Each structure stands twice: as C-alpha cells, then as structure tokens.
C-alpha cells in the first residue's frame, strides 16, 4: 500500500490517502492538547502508545460485535482504516462525574452515576464543541433520522458495557470516554477515530490515580509513564 498526500490533520492524528480509494492511513501524533487546543504540548512516544492501545481496544470491541474502521496496524504509529464519513458529533459516555459535568450540573466530583450517561457535543472547534441534544442533531442535519440517534446511543452503551468490566479486570476504572463514529461507503455505522488515554479518563481502581490526559490538563506530570501503565495493564 502506498501512502499518498495528507488529507487531514487533527489534534492527535494525521490522515493520508492511499492507492486504495476506500482506505486511509491514520498516523498518531505525539502532540498533546487540552481546553480546545488552548493548551499545547508534546510527549515523545505518545503517538506510538496511543496507536497500540487503540488497536488493542478496537480488536477487543470487534470480537464483541462492534464494527470499527480499523483494518490493520502497519507501524508503531500508523493504522490502515476504512474511509468513512465522520458523523459530526462527539459522543461522550460517563460512568463517574468529573470534569465539565461537575461544573455544569454541580454534581460532586467522583460521584458514581446510577447508569451510564450518554451526551453529545457538536464537533466544531470554533464554537467550542458545545453540548447538544437529540433535537439539535436533527435540526442541524447531523444525523439521518431519529433511528440513527438511537443506533449511536446503543452502540455507545454497548461499547461501555464491554470496556467497563474489561478495564475493571485490569484494575482500572473507566470514568468516561469520548468516541467518534463514521459511515462507510455502504452507509454502515462504525466506530472511528481512537479509544486511548487521550479520549478516556482512567483512574487506578484502588488509589484513583489518574492515568490519562488529565495528567497534562492538570499539570500532574508523568504523562508518558501513565500511558505506558495503561498499555501494560491492557496487555497483561
């Protein structure tokens, strides 16, 4: 497969065309961003860690019936993925209240929610990725119909039901996570983007030590060490 010109560069990855019109190469970057890219940094080796972590998680999800855009991993930082049209919604699943949820609703940080909360954000950096509801999704034509909203929510909850016990077995609490979904050329909804410490909050099961991008957001240090610890636990 030939890697061709860059199609898109985001905060954490670059996408490249290939000699197959239905496949792209996704390259994970070492860049770190927070607060809608107002805070920026770089951690050597982070891209490779996220590539490996996300690949392992996507393989786990595929074995459990979740369809993804992943085809194969071809280097330390590169995956071959199916070309798909990204649904312009960030889907957030929360098991424990922290971050923006506590600020918006006044829920005490660390409160275990009675059930997984699914939230939507509009993918628009200029607007600050605002929170939106089902009706917004329909009015803005972000989804095809109400049935697709239900499909998105059901997929998000199924992913959570697979990952929560998996990580619990690795002595990690899956506090919350963000996913992006895409539509293939056959109009099939698939999990796209990544699932990694960049897009999840992981707390140690016993100490509640943060092992994710919050270490960068909150200037806690040892970002790479935390990502390495997550990968080690996934593989063990």
UniProtKB/Swiss-Prot annotation:
Q: NCBIfam families, from UniProt?
A: purC (TIGR00081)
- Tell me yes or no: is Ligase among this UniProt entry's keywords: yes
Protein name (record)? Phosphoribosylaminoimidazole-succinocarboxamide synthase
Against PROSITE patterns, the record matches this protein to: SAICAR_SYNTHETASE_1
A single Pfam family it belongs to is SAICAR_synt
Top enzyme class, one word, equals ligase
Q: Which family does it belong to?
A: Belongs to the SAICAR synthetase family.
MF terms (GO), sorted A to Z: ATP binding; phosphoribosylaminoimidazolesuccinocarboxamide synthase activity
Q: For this protein, what is the EC number?
A: 6.3.2.6
The alphabetized list of GO BP terms reads: 'de novo' IMP biosynthetic process; cobalamin biosynthetic process
Which reactions fall under this protein's catalytic activity?
5-amino-1-(5-phospho-D-ribosyl)imidazole-4-carboxylate + L-aspartate + ATP = (2S)-2-[5-amino-1-(5-phospho-beta-D-ribosyl)imidazole-4-carboxamido]succinate + ADP + phosphate + 2 H(+)
Pathway named in the protein's UniProt entry: Purine metabolism; IMP biosynthesis via de novo pathway; 5-amino-1-(5-phospho-D-ribosyl)imidazole-4-carboxamide from 5-amino-1-(5-phospho-D-ribosyl)imidazole-4-carboxylate: step 1/2
- Recorded source organism is Campylobacter jejuni subsp. jejuni serotype O:2 (strain ATCC 700819 / NCTC 11168)
Its gene is purC
Query: What keyword terms does UniProt attach to this protein?
Result: ATP-binding, Ligase, Nucleotide-binding, Purine biosynthesis
- Statement: the UniProt record of this protein carries the keyword Nucleotide-binding: yes
Instruction: Please give the superkingdom of this protein's source.
Output: Bacteria
